[in-house]
Amino acid sequence: MQTRNTFSWIREEITRSISVSLMIYIITWASISSAYPIFAQQNYENPREATGRIVCANCHLASKPVDIEVPQAVLPDTVFEAVVKIPYDMQLKQVLANGKKGALNVGAVLILPEGFELAPPDRISPEMKEKIGNLSFQNYRPNKKNILVIGPVPGQKYSEITFPILAPDPATNKDVHFLKYPIYVGGNRGRGQIYPDGSKSNNTVYNATAGGIISKILRKEKGGYEITIVDASNERQVIDIIPRGLELLVSEGESIKLDQPLTSNPNVGGFGQGDAEIVLQDPLRVQGLLFFLGSVVLAQIFLVLKKKQFEKVQLSEMNF
């Protein structure tokens, strides 16, 4: 009897642990995946629209700076660094999905020219691996190896993200040529304001959906508010739901207008995009340039020697 009770207790504990773990996973996934560039994979075939706008801006409404550093030129079949910088104040805290305050995460999407791709691990130097850290990059699509995404990752550790990039070789890829190419980047810090289905997150301002008098503000048990607005002209009631984590700007009995902010703006993050240019350099052209420069240097040396020889001849003639 005691053994049966023990097994029953173990079964209940295992079931409870699985349930709690599943709930944590669902909440975490919902609060993270819908707020970073990696989520665009599920909704957009290409992250860059025809207008040049990167689609991450559809969910991250605030504009913030982002920067990218790449070499001016690279040789074919070589590995180089593309460093994306996402600056922000490390002291800032954002509103999380559970209504609490937490640190900001960052994410980025890097759009390379056709043929450029993520460098394989065996081609990455130890120095570059140290800069990369524990980051794990993904292709935007299996057939789009030139578009890379990363995130969410801790912003305090990865406000600078180093992408290891392998340059293509026109000798093996006939679609690639020795030209100047553009590189586009988008980077965000913090959660988004709009979910892909168009609904708001709890990281944005909530406005009144009707004008009138606030007759009641109900604080919900699990956080958040229900604000009842009564239209004085027809006594129609409207209830606005405010999610947890937001600070109210209104109170009961107050008269408000349509679209008037009910909460303060909690967003401390934002999205930005930038671009850079890189030249895929022909090695023969480099060799030709070096040969030309060497020829110029030798010519200068010979001119100097010839001048000195001429001066010696003149000096000897003057002595006679």
From Swiss-Prot:
The keyword Chloroplast applies. InterPro entries: Cyt-f_TM, Cyt_f, Cyt_f_lg_dom, Cyt_f_lg_dom_sf, Rudment_hybrid_motif. The gene is petA. It comes from Brassica rapa subsp. rapa. Keywords: Chloroplast, Electron transport, Heme, Iron, Membrane, Metal-binding, Photosynthesis, Plastid, Signal, Thylakoid, Transmembrane, Transmembrane helix, Transport. It is a single-pass membrane protein. Heme binds at residues 36, 56, 59-60. Pfam families: Apocytochr_F_C, Apocytochr_F_N. Purified from leaves as a water-soluble monomeric protein with a mass of 28.16 kDa, cleavage occurs after Gln-287 and separates the heme-binding from the membrane. Component of the cytochrome b6-f complex, which mediates electron transfer between photosystem II (PSII) and photosystem I (PSI), cyclic electron flow around PSI, and state transitions. This is Cytochrome f. The 4 large subunits of the cytochrome b6-f complex are cytochrome b6, subunit IV (17 kDa polypeptide, petD), cytochrome f and the Rieske protein, while the 4 small subunits are PetG, PetL, PetM and PetN. The complex functions as a dimer. The chain crosses the membrane at residues 286-305. It comes from the Eukaryota. Its cofactor is heme. The keyword Chloroplast applies. One of its GO terms (molecular function) is heme binding. It is found in: Plastid, Chloroplast thylakoid membrane. HAMAP family: Cytb6_f_cytF. GO terms for biological process: photosynthesis. Belongs to the cytochrome f family. Residues 1-35 form the signal peptide. The lineage of its organism: Eukaryota, Viridiplantae, Streptophyta, Embryophyta, Tracheophyta. Binds 1 heme group covalently. One of its GO terms (cellular component) is chloroplast thylakoid membrane. Its main location: plastid.
